[in-house]
Amino acid sequence: MAAATGGLTPEQIIAVDGAHLWHPYSSIGREAVSPVVAVAAHGAWLTLIRDGQPIEVLDAMSSWWTAIHGHGHPALDQALTTQLRVMNHVMFGGLTHEPAARLAKLLVDITPAGLDTVFFSDSGSVSVEVAAKMALQYWRGRGLPGKRRLMTWRGGYHGDTFLAMSICDPHGGMHSLWTDVLAAQVFAPQVPRDYDPAYSAAFEAQLAQHAGELAAVVVEPVVQGAGGMRFHDPRYLHDLRDICRRYEVLLIFDEIATGFGRTGALFAADHAGVSPDIMCVGKALTGGYLSLAATLCTADVAHTISAGAAGALMHGPTFMANPLACAVSVASVELLLGQDWRTRITELAAGLTAGLDTARALPAVTDVRVCGAIGVIECDRPVDLAVATPAALDRGVWLRPFRNLVYAMPPYICTPAEITQITSAMVEVARLVGSLP
């Protein structure tokens, strides 16, 4: 069967893929599950090729948490094509342009108070690198170059570049292979789901021991994403803000996965009503169209860095502030803000909660949890993709479980019936996990 894939048949695509392409977190030559060929994406649906035939499946992953408006939204398509006719790309060194200015102003307006300066980069991982670089340069500008370590709590994930890996969970995360060569950071115990003042007190005591060498505390607020899809009480963020201020340590929020409404607040920090010194956003920023991220910081951070010995923030991506990415990001954010997104997320949360409830009785299930438009089934053993993927496809859903987690972060446009279809597939996958030895 030929498809709209540049002349290659699905069989040819798989052959080229197997010979030449490396996929995320995969091996070459011994992949247990071959990739599925995607040929189209519209709304909340993907068109995949299975057994030589096209099938329509729901994108329950929002294509790794990016496509909050679904695929091919007319407003985003128009923004991209309009900008393409004017200017596809220019270097950002020495030049500026309207899409970057509009997006920067929009982000400053909607993010927590005080984040007045924006640095654009190519990806979430790079935005974390930039945030860490900001923190280190800030303290050098303050005449305290010894403040160069970072502190976080266990269970987090912040990206795949080297500094970002150093603040991912050192043992349970995806980067334990590199523990002996990564920068040695300070790790507090896993943050509990429910609020416990004793945890905050212990965190403060540990931070106090290292305050003289700490540049910043870095955390994912409310939801720890790829490190385990764990949720925690927003009051911990309020405590972190107070602790960091008292001990003169910067506070960095990684909102790459949580930003733009996913948790039920526009940004997860809003649940606690606190502002970090530095914040990273990405993923849903462009609505899933292009790769773009941003690192925002306070005027104090920006001016201190600029007044330091280097006289500049020493970072500059080639595709920084790409006009196409900025233009579609403006359209995506304005589309979100122009609708009753809070009600939409509340409805999605209700649908996920109701649909996943039956999973609680399954023998392999240890927890079921929902936060905004995030639904998670945690199992007592790893999920076998060779079993999970076809089972979900049988039910018209694209899922991508990892470790012992079956989860969904669906597009905000999903109907109640589509959410029911997604949760039914998740429950079936969890049931199969329990039926295997």
Curated annotation (Swiss-Prot):
Annotated site (Participates in the substrate recognition with KAPA and in a stacking interaction with the adenine ring of SAM): Y25
Database matches in Gene3D superfamilies: Aspartate Aminotransferase, domain 1, Type I PLP-dependent aspartate aminotransferase-like (Major domain)
Compartments, record wording: Cytoplasm
Deletion phenotype: Cells lacking this gene are shown to be highly attenuated in a mouse tuberculosis model.
Signal peptide: none
A molecular-function term among this protein's GO annotations: adenosylmethionine-8-amino-7-oxononanoate transaminase activity
Keyword vocabulary terms for this entry: Aminotransferase, Biotin biosynthesis, Cytoplasm, Pyridoxal phosphate, S-adenosyl-L-methionine, Transferase
Chemical reaction(s) catalysed: (8S)-8-amino-7-oxononanoate + S-adenosyl-L-methionine = S-adenosyl-4-methylsulfanyl-2-oxobutanoate + (7R,8S)-7,8-diammoniononanoate
Pathway terms, separated by semicolons: Cofactor biosynthesis; biotin biosynthesis; 7,8-diaminononanoate from 8-amino-7-oxononanoate (SAM route): step 1/1
Protein name: Adenosylmethionine-8-amino-7-oxononanoate aminotransferase
Taxonomic source organism: Mycobacterium tuberculosis (strain ATCC 25618 / H37Rv)
Gene name linked to the record: bioA
